[in-house]
Amino acid sequence: MTPSSPPPPAFYYLTNFERALAWLGERYDDVFDDRERAFLQAFPSLPQASRALLVRMLMRNGPDFRASKLAYDEIGCPLAAAAPLVAAGWVDPAPVLTLDEIFALCTKAELLRMFAALGAHAGERKSEWLDRLRLEHDMAQPFDVWFSGAGQPGAGQPEAGHPGAGRDDHVLRVTVGALCDRLRLMFFGNLHQDWSEFVLADLGVFQYESVPFAPSSRAFQRRGDVDAYLALHACRDALDAWPDDAPLEALVDAIGTVACGQPWLETRRAKLLFAVGQAGERRGAWPLALDAYARSAWPGSRHRRIRVLERSGRDDDALALALDARAAFESDEERQRVERMLPRLQRRAGRAVERAAAAPDVPRDTLVLARPDTFVSVEYAVRDHLAQPGAPVHYVENTLINSLFGLLCWEPVFAAVPGAFFHPFQRGPADLHAPDFAARRADAFAACFAQLDSGAYRETIRRHYATKLGLQSPFVFWGVLSPELLDEALACLPPAHLRLWFARLLADIRSNRSGLPDLVRFWPAERRYELIEVKGPGDRLQDNQTRWLGYCIGHGMPVRVVDVEWAGDVVVPAAAAGHCA
């Protein structure tokens, strides 16, 4: 929300939640079980304060909440609001709490009074108390019993008048958390977003493309798809909590047994197996890492297998796999990594070392500039220095090529492919970085690329610029793409070059949407351009920048690197500086 935006309505979060429930109810009734269906039917009939309280608790870390911490002006008394939730069976008004749970709910001062008779003292941290008390205190009891000291001879009593202390406070436990997490997953398509991130579209802060949701485009086609996602998510959580000294083979097997009936779920499995492989590498568990990577189709898995084979001393196997990769690289990133490894692998395997193909010679000039009196980025300094009447220079970095691609290919990017769109407030498809993103939309992308041959691309880009202006997009940078920049780009960038850029971008969106040169200079009268990568003193080209520069040079595109030095810092031959006019 911008500073000038009005504050949201008092119950904005409840409106969001109810919209999500209505959205799900219209599209997934056949996927719900009886309990979920009953929840969706009963929720609207509860008093507004009760509905709001439940959503507030779902938006916070739970499932246990002290009533004194649920103070919301629009809700009023939390206990009164909770009564209908208790009657519905969605909230437990007197949960039995373990030692760990009571520690999570209470302050250090409260715990000190509660466990004074057991030797707790102020000099210890809460975590130290908890570790020690676990060894001698395994009971579970309601909150008021913990606070009264029952069962703890000599335990301290709460101070009189202490707000929310002891029996004056209550704990409420949400018992429909798992059910609502399942609904949250079905709406957002993931479990890292929560209801607090759900922004009302009609606040005008963000606007989204309208994506048609046909039954065939649903991400979850059957209940088992939701179960599969949750099973993979549980495996991911297990990996994060897995003890360092425990073998990971059982987790790999568990991931393999999940029944993934959708391609996008298989992609999630592949990504998870890749993460397990990385964990195996960190532990030096080479066989486990190899197995996980071999089962994974996630980009980079083959390169990691080569690394593991090398690190485990299997030099011949590492070389053989690297040569297989060289025969058909999966991406430019893999090509760059494997070509760096091959000479070393050949030496280690006792083979003749093949000379790597020479990298394209990228034109490189040095420009000496007076150091600005106030801070100006080196890219802007070069832009201002090079700009001339009839030859404007723009700082665009990754924004221009991405934006032109996004405008030309708007329809395939926002195609309602299963697993791509879950709700009406998405910036882009959820599978944007999946290895099969382009393949699942191949015909639509081919139709867009064909416009580069027919000349229709200019009209399509201009039409989308006019009709989609301001809509969220993973590619289009509306704040950078001015009408003037768009006109100059369409006049000066050849469609053959656009096709090459777009094809490379689409081949590996995760890696190739960044690394493009900083500046573009146009000569509109001559309908030509050049791309310029700017490097300040001490800056080096990054791998993705090197790949883009090599690609452009290899296809005959006008591109160069300009190294900037500040006058007075170093002495640069005049001839070297003279190329930047």
For the regions a language model picked out, list residue spans one by one:
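Basic, glycine-rich
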Residues: M1, V564-A581
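Alpha-helical protein-protein interaction scaffolds
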Residues: G261-A352
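Short acidic, S/G/P-rich loop/turn micro-motifs used as interaction or catalytic elements
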Residues: N61, A328, P537-R540
